[in-house]
Amino acid sequence: EVIGGILMPGDGAADPSGVTHMLAKGARMEGAQIFEKSPVEEILTKDGKISGVKVNGQKIDCEYIVLASGMWSRQIAERVGVSVPLYPAEHFYIITEPIENLSKTLPVIRDFDNSTYIKEDAGKILVGIFEKKSIPAFNKTNIVPEDFSFGEFPENFEHFEPYLASAIKRFPVLEKAGIRKFFAGPESFTPDTNTLLGEVPEIKNFFVCCGLNSIGIGSGGGVGKVTAEWLMTGHINQDIFCYDIKRFQKFHSELGFI
């Protein structure tokens, strides 16, 4: 059944929390200020241009805003009439019980035909899916609660089971491995599964950097660099229209479409 595969020896794994703290430390070293637990209350504009933001009752004057609020980006942008075609879907994975003699250097394996991915996780195996027909999150409303940062959905093993069966067929070691954790949580996606970058057409100096389609840990550094260059120079010296938010029309962010 397996005709061949592609190995990328330069790939690796990273701790998301560690990477986040590293980037935050680097930003602070360059003079950036970071305010946690500070929800955006209002985006301020004047004459069709960004003028500031209101956070925790405090008005902060600014010339530019970069919206990088993950799955909350769409509803934040809506407050000022900006269309961001982003939708949260339910994402599933399981973590097995510990497996004896499991290699810590097991490659992260993507089985595109069966929509699964498999990787080592502290002596256990994680099996996740990126299925073609996913389940819309939050009852198809696309309204993400403000306090849902680490929230989970009820288990849906009926939806996950066919993909697990395919994974077991590909990796028989899973057949006798118990399941320690079944995770179901939201992940936001764009209609074409490409990132949303660049200045929005509705408001000048309003940039977006969101819709990373569950590959933020791998592409975050690159999209951050591109966004910074774009913001500082007003253009980018390469063709990245496939990521430019202007590739979409207003109707693309309507619930009936996404």
What are these language model-derived features?
Residues 2, 139-142, 200-204:
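The feature captures the short pre-catalytic strand/loop hairpin that immediately precedes
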Residues 113, 122, 152-258:
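C-terminal catalytic lobe of FAD-dependent flavoproteins
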Residues 33, 83, 175-178:
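Conserved beta-strand segments of alpha/beta enzyme cores
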Residues 1-2, 44-51, 189-193, 203:
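A short, glycine/Asx- and small/polar-enriched loop/turn
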Residues 6-64, 68, 72:
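Helical element adjacent to the flavin cofactor pocket in flavoenzyme catalytic cores
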Residues 26, 30, 79, 226-234:
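Active-site catalytic microenvironments for nucleophilic, acid-base chemistry
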Residues 42-141, 145-154, 162-170, 250-258:
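Flavin-dependent oxidoreductases
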